[in-house]
Amino acid sequence: MSELDLSVDQTLDMTNIDPSKDGIDHIRINLNDTATLLGERLFIDHIRVFYHPRYGSFISISAAVTWYKLKNKDENIRSLCGARLREYVDKQIKSGENEYEVKFIPDNLLEEFLVYSIMSKPDLLEMVMSNKLPYVAYYFDSDNKFKMRDKQMTRILNNIKPKLVDLNN
């Protein structure tokens, strides 16, 4: 039996991404402007319900991350994502009902959220395991300048395959 290749190409210059090469030399993680289904499905707001053994169920990675960061663990957040999540949390913060307890989520916890969310969808797990291209989450600002986003998530995704293998064995 041959050994599973868990490598992801690490040679891409992350400061000089050519969006026309999405799906060729990288996977763009974005909800709408991506050439690949994998890039769309890995977006932080993409709906993929998953269960974390310590923290419970969430509708998306963004819901899990936001819930974790807030002081008052509002159960409604588990089922919100995208603009609805941001509006709900903004309203809570402005009214004083809630506040951020932490600014950042630890790498190991974000990795756990990503692992459990990917494993919750067998087809997504298969796509991630077969991908050899680096992941990059980015957008272009109003001046059409390249901007990276979700850097922590991108970094973790580019090194997640061994963890997925460990949990599947």
Where on the chain are the PLM-derived regions?
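Charged, low-complexity intrinsically disordered segments
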Residues: S2-N169
